């Protein structure tokens, strides 16, 4: 994928940035695509950098993701909780699976969805081959992760754990309005009022 370059005029002349670095200057982190260890490490590094720059200023995490590896997503989530800077989450396009979990884990009152975004929650997926004992061990770990994710999402949404358990048994799709009623987001936005943009 070709990453666009942005050229800016400064007092010292021209500076060029790749688009993601330019967004980082405005404290915007973009999480696009499937969440794996490489993507997770990039997002974590950006969050830690912005925390070091200004621990009191909001960070805006834009999410357009089908989900991904649970441990990679949990690493991002734990970093969001670890840093002092409030992390606002914004769904653009879709936030599914671990993407929806991260969306719900943003700062209360600062979790958003754009008008036509979709959100989907479900239970963790897993596949493992090997000896019966090892398969059993991995199945137990997936069940432990499922329980933990449901408990955390219940905490963020205000829904009972039992409802999360029932709703995540299968793919559960929501519009922005549905996600707002569910407690995954706080507001639906159609214009940029959160990072100072205007049109």
From Swiss-Prot:
<keyword id="KW-0378">Hydrolase</keyword>
<dbReference type="InterPro" id="IPR018215">
    <property type="entry name" value="ClpP_Ser_AS"/>
</dbReference>
<dbReference type="InterPro" id="IPR001907">
    <property type="entry name" value="ClpP"/>
</dbReference>
<keyword id="KW-0963">Cytoplasm</keyword>
<comment type="function">
    <text>Cleaves peptides in various proteins in a process that requires ATP hydrolysis. Has a chymotrypsin-like activity. Plays a major role in the degradation of misfolded proteins.</text>
</comment>
<dbReference type="GO" id="GO:0005737">
    <property type="term" value="C:cytoplasm"/>
</dbReference>
<dbReference type="GO" id="GO:0006515">
    <property type="term" value="P:protein quality control for misfolded or incompletely synthesized proteins"/>
</dbReference>
<keyword id="KW-0720">Serine protease</keyword>
<comment type="similarity">
    <text>Belongs to the peptidase S14 family.</text>
</comment>
<comment type="subunit">
    <text>Fourteen ClpP subunits assemble into 2 heptameric rings which stack back to back to give a disk-like structure with a central cavity, resembling the structure of eukaryotic proteasomes.</text>
</comment>
<dbReference type="GO" id="GO:0051117">
    <property type="term" value="F:ATPase binding"/>
</dbReference>
<feature type="active site" description="Nucleophile">
    <location>
        <position position="97"/>
    </location>
</feature>
<dbReference type="GO" id="GO:0004252">
    <property type="term" value="F:serine-type endopeptidase activity"/>
</dbReference>
<dbReference type="GO" id="GO:0004176">
    <property type="term" value="F:ATP-dependent peptidase activity"/>
</dbReference>
<keyword id="KW-0645">Protease</keyword>
<dbReference type="InterPro" id="IPR023562">
    <property type="entry name" value="ClpP/TepA"/>
</dbReference>
<dbReference type="InterPro" id="IPR029045">
    <property type="entry name" value="ClpP/crotonase-like_dom_sf"/>
</dbReference>
<feature type="active site">
    <location>
        <position position="122"/>
    </location>
</feature>
<dbReference type="Pfam" id="PF00574">
    <property type="entry name" value="CLP_protease"/>
</dbReference>
<protein>
    <recommendedName>
        <fullName>ATP-dependent Clp protease proteolytic subunit</fullName>
        <ecNumber>3.4.21.92</ecNumber>
    </recommendedName>
</protein>
<dbReference type="GO" id="GO:0009368">
    <property type="term" value="C:endopeptidase Clp complex"/>
</dbReference>
